Amino acid sequence: MTLSFPPAAWWGIMVAYPDLPGQTNKGVHMASQPFPELFQPGRIGEMTLRNRIVMPPMGTNFAEPDGSIGQRSIDYYEARARGGVGLVIVEVTGVELSRGKTIRRQIGIDDDKFVDGLSRLSEAIHRHGARSAIQIHHAGRLGHAVEPIAPSSVMLPPSHRTPREMTGGEIEEMIGRYAAGARRARLAGFDGVEIH
């Protein structure tokens, strides 16, 4: 089978390379600009973005062992904001770290103790003109807890265990955990929340 793709100019390829001595190209050059709207301000509800480039949430494993934000996380996200992204969405942030983690060093938002670090993170993103959102998350049946939980007891093959089906009360409690996570995100200065 042969795959064919449109010419690179159609994709709007961005090429990054170091400046040569005596040049002031800032290291990033557009090979073409077939989508000029991409670089225009955009809106999500009442929120205005400087452009329509969005960095999606991607798990980095950069959180501190207890789920707090350290300098490595701040540096990582600040670099993306400095690079010109319009909206930075911070990775999988646990609403229940004790039994809802997907990755070992996952950011936490299930306790007020995390708000200060998350505030420093949102401030670092905002400092460079980007907007910030945070993805709040519970692993459910994908969790690594002793007893994973989910709305139904359906296993995710091939390597996960069958989760315990949540009770109605546990589902209500989980809704409350997401609401509390969203409240903490707002207290920390994030412009939006993505529910995972």
Annotate each language-model stretch with its function.
Residues 10-196:
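Flavin-dependent oxidoreductase catalytic cores
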Residues 4-5:
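Serine residues within intrinsically disordered or low-complexity segments
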